[in-house]
């Protein structure tokens, strides 16, 4: 009996499938002639305007023609420039991991105070900006507590002044403006859709016996990084850096990756990442800015990643601390570079003196 029922249901399913297939073909045949040609549309418009005693509509884009191009030219135009960037930024002064609000603010400030530095800005997503495209709970407006609004003035981003804070009409206005300023700097290269999979850590004699420093990042295209485990031999690439600024955000699938990796390497004081505390806007923003620092030699932490390592409160949907923490991180990065150069010079002088003795 069960077999007969299965056969019957199979026949019904086959009939329904045949009907749906036939219906799809019928719809496709009917749909094709329903789009009139542009010439027919233009003639109809001209006739209607003439009856109304109006001149024909013209636009600057009538009979628009593009310059000729070959597909191979497009290929070479993209490929040549991308690999030129990969070659030039294989050794960078600063690598910023994460192009959210803190990472972008850091890149912006580096361009202002040290435009000669070569800065590689890494972002695992196709679209940089992190969570700064919207305010809280997917709302449009962005709240920035004073005096962080001074950066908005510098960028000429309009806002509504509410006394102790300002409101940007749409968060995307600030983020897109900040991004455009960053990318105009010829010494900044954004590598989006590029994941940082690991850190380069090396011994540094200038730091004394057993001293280690972060010396760069291990990178891969994001889609390749997500496919690990499905294929073998998908080795990464590398970028050496004088200093790495980690702006990876709070914990999550792609969050706090820099400080979590340091913990696994035994380089975080206390040996673990406690995670951020409960939300307290009043306390959180000041804590984030004032604790922005070089956590280990060669690596500066900025933004909400600091809350993960310090156990400080989460901040919620206010963005002033992200902006100012990123800007402070830029100054910390420049100071770290200068300190490293001074230590290296002192170590070289000491080695030369010993050799002469």
Curated annotation (Swiss-Prot):
Localisation per UniProt entry: Plastid, Chloroplast
Cofactor(s) this protein cannot do without: Fe cation
Protein modification: During the catalytic reaction, a sulfide is transferred from Cys-233 to a reaction intermediate, generating a dehydroalanine residue.
Keywords: Chloroplast, Iron, Metal-binding, NAD, Plastid, Thiamine biosynthesis, Transferase
Root EC class: transferase
InterPro entries: FAD/NAD-bd_sf, Sti35, Thi4_fam
BP GO annotations: thiamine biosynthetic process; thiazole biosynthetic process
Gene Ontology cellular component list: chloroplast stroma; cytosol
Predominant cellular place of this UniProt entry's protein: plastid
Binding site for substrate: 102, 123-124, 131, 196, 235, 250, 304, 314-316
GO MF terms held by the record: cysteine-dependent adenosine diphosphate thiazole synthase activity; iron ion binding
Complexes and interactors: Homooctamer.
Further comment: This protein may be expected to contain an N-terminal transit peptide but none has been predicted.
Stated role: Involved in biosynthesis of the thiamine precursor thiazole. Catalyzes the conversion of NAD and glycine to adenosine diphosphate 5-(2-hydroxyethyl)-4-methylthiazole-2-carboxylic acid (ADT), an adenylated thiazole intermediate. The reaction includes an iron-dependent sulfide transfer from a conserved cysteine residue of the protein to a thiazole intermediate. The enzyme can only undergo a single turnover, which suggests it is a suicide enzyme. May have additional roles in adaptation to various stress conditions and in DNA damage tolerance.
Family named by the database record: Belongs to the THI4 family.
Name of this protein: Thiamine thiazole synthase, chloroplastic
Organism, as annotated: Chlamydomonas reinhardtii
Chain's gene name: THI1
